[in-house]
From Swiss-Prot:
Name assigned to this protein: Protein FAM193A
Record field: compositional bias (Basic and acidic residues): 882-909, 921-935
Biased composition (Basic residues): 872-881, 937-946, 1156-1166
Residue numbers of Phosphoserine PTMs: S293, S648, S1136, S1151
Keyword Lyase: no
Gene: Fam193a
Cited PANTHER family: AGAP004327-PA, PROTEIN FAM193A
Length: 1231
């Protein structure tokens, strides 16, 4: 569109030059084209918008934009606003106006109409441009919001671990039963969590747009001290000690949000917002420009919530004065001490004060010597309230916090990025009013800080990237609920001095929750180790050294000092050294402030940090400690992470004492605001002489003086705690009663000061205590106050490192110790790694120097082969050998069986050949005799008699045979049954009626074969007869029978062939009867089977010869029966099963011997010979279908196989059943 219009415009311009007369027509044409294009675009947009309902209704509607408006804007922006077009439009319009002046009515109307259209379109486009500007603003705002949300999401993702830790802490605290303060804290927090939406009404912060998610709610609870219910003014300082112990922890916990922010800039971890914690910012400081608008809110908030959290509102003016003085002297540290002294609870009691303390602690951690805050407060300490008004009197904690911030940047990603690069000028900012010091004017608020207003607060505390965000760590909650904070409110919350005091308690709690009443086990030695290993790597902890050594550290200290004591300390960092000395003096004034005193710790730590700020800044990046003492950022992260930061700071100072200042060991009771012995009443009057040394003067002025007097922080520490004051009796448990910031550990090195000399034995004891991190007093957020309950440690570290099992000893909640040990372990590993690398390199060098031949030999050598592979190969070879051997044995077995079968077949063939030859001869003779007999018809009668005689003779022979067999076998019964059956075929061969299924008790050959069936069920396993025995016994018997049949059938030559066939069949069928007999013999008298078989064979041979002779003699007599025999032999029909059964029964019954005896014999003898006889009765290993064999023989083989199969099955079944039965009995018996 634009191109077309510009092309038309250029063409019109060219045409105008030669002839101006063409101006109006050309202008008319171009403008009309322009308007037509615009109208077409609007129409197209309207048409398309019908299909874009979702886009317009759900998205564009947010910005009050329509598709048509969007297109009009595009036309106006791209086409109508085109410079070339705009430059020519006036001329074109003038041409059109000229056209209206023509006298041609038609032309005038045309031009006038076009002119009106153009003017309307121009006005519409102008409105579109204006409307679009508004829409663009909305769109930009939406884009910014989305970008902010994404950035926040990214930050929240980074803070996820911190959130989980915090939630775990919250759960532990919820389940933790401590003093009423603890319960109040739990109830308050539960209420806050349950009613997150109402959190904007938080009395501790003005911010009303907090995120309602669980993480942010918890963060807000921790940050604003909501966990601690507002303390009423009527609560007195004397109540503070108990409350302080837990309150400081909670406050410190609240501080942790900033610490957590170190890990991730999540809102939950963001530092306390000034609005949230106006107390933290002195009124004057609160107004500090560095805090931006929040600064303005801070003063009002502090004033507004003075009742609830009166930092300076102490019932006793002396307490206030002392606290203010302490704060002034400590430049916040003094206040912290005073507050703690007045009531460790006071500092922790008022959320604001504790927060202020936290900030103060942060400032100290930033590296500002606690003394600096003290000095600053001392300046403003003349009146606690003056401190509020005075920039110099910003809560020492807050200025200290600012200073701390300088070294200990907020751990959020934004601050962390800037922390390392914090310029010295930012440090010098300490010269500015304390409130502004932390918020280095040079450091503008990072644009991303507003993402976590509930963490960073409206006032971007992050402006001072060094301002360490209080770490909400599990240890932050170890102290009882904010009851301490509640108690604290009675303290003059209004006075910024008190705020610093509160800060001191809470900050110390943050830094030393374990050390201050919660972690008696936390030792300066541990802190030193942490400090040295992580941050310093330098065991010389001379604070003076640190301050002068590190420019940045000096800057930090200087600003802090100047901030705390603008009068005493000039803004420039050069003042830092004096400030340090002043701080030391103040410490002396404080008289042995507990090394755990957060401010003191910070003073020293700040000194160290100042000296090592740069190095620490680097380490702090790694260590997420935003602890004031750890502000150095070396291992600050550790301290931030754990409420033990204060202990760690204290340890740092203790470490300083140990390393460089053995002579000075702060020994202030944890309950004291500065770590001095907590007094039941924070009021100076309440302080005992012993405690007085710790808080020589609760009044701020004394502290400034003392601070100035103190030559050095070490010296101060020496005299710091000449007489450690025991925690107030009100504190039942050091961890509970004493404010977290107060070191309640009797072994606390801070308390170990003997005439200013550090006691190495005590140090050793502390070391051991540290080693044994399992301490009920350790500051921990574990749900269980009693570590001896046997429950597994549920701290985040054990959860992370998998130490979930129940500990052998009480589980330690001393997170600072844990971190220290972990860091030490890490450093050791790092130190060992270079050695390992060197060793590895040496090894590699040795290998590299080896010759290629050696390497190849080594690679190819058999020794190089892994044992597993050789074993596997050996197993494979062994398996292969087994398989080969098995195959070989199987082949040999097959060969033997094959040979055996061949031999048997040969023997059978030979026997059959002999029998056939004999039969042929007999047949020939009989044939001749028959021919002769035919001629002699007259002999028929004689023939009839002869057959009867023959039958009688055969019967006699059978009887003789039976008698013989019976004599051979001891069991006549068995022999009767078997021999009768075997003999019956012979006798029955003469009587065709037997074969005709006559009901004779003697079964025929076929019947006999079937007759074994009844025997099978009795003992199928014994039905199998040895093949050889069958061959020996059956074949002779069959031969005899065949001979009988052949004699009868020898009528004609034609019958010879049939007789030969039938002889084979009977020879095979009769084998069955012997088989059955053998079957019976086997069960009844198996041992005698072999001799019987031999005897039977002999008998059969004899009978055969006798029969042959008889048949030869009686051929003529048997001729008449040939036909009948022929029929019987040719078609022998097996008797019906009933007949077989009857036959079998009759045979057995006919035997004279009783059955019982036979059975007994069968059992006895069968057991002995069954194994040897089984091999004999096995069937032949041949293919019955493929081998050419007689039907009878095939049937016998089939029967053998049937018996074998059934026997096997029966055996298997029987054995299994019996075994199972016995096992079942055993199991039942067992049950």
């Amino acid at each position: 569109m634009k191109v077309r219009l510009l092309r038309q415009l250029s063409a019109a311009a060219k045409a105008k030059a030669p002839s101006g007369l063409q101006g109006p027509p050309q202008a008319h044409h171009f403008v009309s084209l322009l308007l037509e294009e615009y109208a077409a675009l609007c129409q197209a947009a309207r048409s398309i918008s019908t299909f874009l309902g979702t886009l317009e209704n759900e998205h564009l509607k947010k910005f009050q934009v329509t598709w048509e408006l969007h297109n009009k804007h595009l036309f106006e922006n791209l086409v109508f606003s085109e410079p070339l077009l705009q430059s020519n439009l006036p001329a074109l319009v003038s041409q059109i106006r000229l056209g209206t002046t023509t006298h041609d009515t038609c032309t005038e109307d045309m031009y006038s109409t076009l002119l009106q259209r153009y003017q309307r379109s121009e006005e519409e486009l102008r409105k579109v441009a204006e409307e679009w500007l508004e829409c663009q603003k909305r769109i930009d705002a939406y884009v910014d919001e989305q970008m902010t949300m994404k950035t926040k999401q990214r930050m929240l993702t980074e803070d996820w671990e911190i959130f989980k830790q915090r939630r775990l802490i919250e759960e532990q605290l919820t389940n933790k039963k401590v003093v009423t303060g603890e319960n109040n804290f739990t109830d308050t927090r539960r209420h806050m969590l349950s009613s997150r939406l109402s959190m904007p009404d938080c009395p501790n912060c003005n911010y009303r747009r907090r995120c309602a998610c669980d993480d942010c709610s918890l963060s807000h609870i921790l940050t604003c001290g909501i966990m601690d219910t507002p303390v009423t003014d009527d609560i007195h300082i004397h109540q503070l000690p108990l409350q302080v112990d837990s309150a400081p922890d909670y406050l410190s916990e609240m501080r942790p949000p900033s610490v957590s922010s170190a890990s991730s800039g999540s809102g939950s971890s963001s530092p306390i917002t000034i609005q949230q914690h106006p107390r933290l910012i002195l009124t004057d400081n609160g107004s500090a420009p560095t805090f931006c608008s929040d600064d303005e809110d801070v003063a009002p908030l502090s004033a507004k919530f003075a009742d609830i959290y009166p930092l300076t509102n102490y019932d006793d003016t002396n307490v206030v004065a002392n606290m203010n003085g302490i704060h002034s002297e400590l430049n916040g540290g003094g206040e912290n001490m005073a507050l703690k002294d007045e009531s460790p609870q006071v500092s922790s009691t008022s959320r604001s004060s504790s927060e202020a303390d936290d900030e103060d602690a942060d400032g100290e951690s930033s590296g500002e010597p606690p003394g600096a805050p003290k000095q600053e407060e001392a300046i403003g300490n003349g009146n606690p309230k003056t401190e509020e008004s005075n920039v110099n009197t910003p809560p020492p904690s807050y200025p200290a916090q600012q200073a701390e911030q300088t070294p200990n940047t907020c751990e959020c990603h934004v601050c962390k990025q800037e922390a390392s690069g914090l310029p010295a000028s930012a440090m010098t900012a300490g010269a500015l009013p304390p409130g502004h010091q932390f918020l280095s004017p040079e450091k503008p608020t990072h644009p991303a800080l507003h993402l976590y207003p509930h963490i960073h607060g409206h006032v971007p505390l992050h402006t001072v990237p060094h301002l360490p965000r209080p770490l909400i760590h599990p240890t932050l909650y170890p102290a009882p609920p904010f009851t301490h904070s509640k108690a604290l409110p009675p303290a003059p919350v209004q006075s910024h001095t008190n705020k610093p005091q509160a800060f001191n308690a809470s900050l110390q709690d943050h830094i030393y929750p374990s050390c201050f009443g919660n972690t008696p086990d936390w030792n300066s030695s541990k802190f030193i180790s942490l400090w040295e290993s992580e941050m310093m790597n330098d065991k010389n902890w001379n604070p003076g050294t640190f301050l002068p050594d590190t420019i940045s550290g000096n800057d930090i200290l200087g600003p802090v000092l100047s901030e705390t004591r603008p009068e005493a300390l000039p803004p420039p960092p050069s003042n830092e050294a004096p400030a340090v000395s002043d701080i030391k003096e103040k410490k002396n004034a404080a008289k042995k402030k507990c090394l755990y005193n957060f401010q003191d710790a910070f003073m020293e730590a700040n000194e160290v940090a100042m000296a090592n700020t740069v190095a620490m800044a680097t380490s702090s990046a790694t260590s997420s400690v935003s602890c004031t003492a750890t502000t150095v950022q070396s291992s600050s992260s550790q301290f931030k992470v754990s409420s033990r930061r204060p202990p760690s700071i204290g340890d740092v100072f203790h470490g300083l004492n140990k390393e460089d200042h053995r002579h000075s060991a702060p020994a202030a009771p944890r309950n004291s605001p500065t770590g001095l012995a907590p007094l039941p009443a924070l009021s100076p009057s309440a302080l005992s002489p012993a405690s007085t040394p710790h808080l020589p003067n609760l009044a701020a002025p004394s502290f400034p003086k003392t601070a100035t007097t103190a030559p050095g922080f070490v010296d101060t520490r020496k005299s710091f705690c000449p007489t450690p004051v025991a925690p107030p009796p009100s504190t039942t448990d050091g961890s509970i009663s004493a404010p977290p910031s107060v070191c309640s550990d009797p072994d606390c090195e801070g308390h170990r000061c003997e005439n200013g000399v550090y006691d190495p034995q005590q140090d050793d004891g502390d070391e051991s205590a540290d080693e044994d991190s399992c301490s009920e007093h350790s500051s921990s957020t574990s749900t269980s106050t009693n570590q001896k309950e046997g429950k597994y440690c549920d701290c985040c570290y054990c959860e992370f490192f998998g130490h979930g099992g129940p500990p052998a000893a009480p589980t330690s909640r001393n997170y600072a110790e844990m971190r220290e040990k972990l860091r030490l372990r890490l450093t050791k590993r790092k130190e060992e790694q270079p050695k390992k690398m060197e060793q590895i390199s040496e090894r590699e060098g040795v290998v590299d120097h080896r010759r290629v031949e050696d390497l190849l030999q080594f690679i190819n050598s058999s020794e190089a082969k892994p044992v597993s592979s050789s074993r596997a190969a050996k197993r494979a070879r062994h398996k292969q050998r087994k398989l080969e051997e098995k195959a070989r044995l199987e082949a040999e077995a097959r060969a033997r069986e094959h040979l055996h079968h061949q031999e048997e077949q040969k023997q059978r063939e030979e026997e059959e050949d002999e029998e056939e030859e004999d039969e042929e001869q007999h047949f020939k003779e009989e044939f001749q005799r028959l021919q002769e007999l035919q001629k002699l018809r007259a002999a028929k009668k004689k023939k009839k008699d002869r057959p009867s005689k023959d039958c009688s003779k055969l019967d006699m022979l059978a009887r003789n045979f039976q008698a013989a067999t019976e004599s051979i076998s001891n069991s006549e019964n068995i022999h009767n049954g078997s021999l009768e059956q075997t003999e019956e075929p012979e006798t029955s061969s003469h009587s065709p009626s037997r074969h005709m299924n006559h009901s004779e008790p003697r079964p025929g050959p076929g019947a006999n074969g079937d007759a074994t069936d009844p025997v099978d069920p009795r003992d199928p396993s014994k039905l199998l007869l040895p093949k050889e025995v069958n061959g020996k016994q059956h074949e002779p018997l069959a031969f005899l029978l065949d001979m009988m049949h052949h004699h009868k059938e020898g009528n004609s030559k034609q019958k010879l062939k049939q007789t030969s066939k039938t002889s084979n069949e009977p020879a095979r069928k009769p084998t069955e009867p012997p088989k059955t007999t053998e079957v019976q013999l086997k069960p009844r008298a198996q041992p005698e089977l072999k001799p019987k078989v031999v005897d039977l064979a002999l008998l059969t041979e004899q009978k055969r010869e006798e029969r042959k002779t008889n048949s030869n003699n009686n051929n003529k007599k048997q001729l008449s029966h040939i036909k009948e025999e022929k029929l019987s032999t040719v078609t022998p029909e097996p008797p019906s099963p009933s007949q077989l059964l009857q036959n079998g029964r009759l045979i057995l019954a006919s035997s004279p011997q009783p059955k019982g005896k036979n059975k007994k014999n069968k059992k006895k003898k069968g057991d002995r010979t069954s194994s040897s006889l089984d091999d004999v009765f096995l069937p032949k290993d041949i293919d019955l279908d493929s081998v050419d064999m007689d039907e009878t023989e095939r049937e016998v083989e089939y029967f053998k196989r049937f018996c074998l199969d059934s026997a096997r099955q029966n055996r298997q079944r029987l054995s299994i059943n019996w075994s199972n039965f016995s096992l079942k009995k055993a199991t039942f018996a067992a049950h």
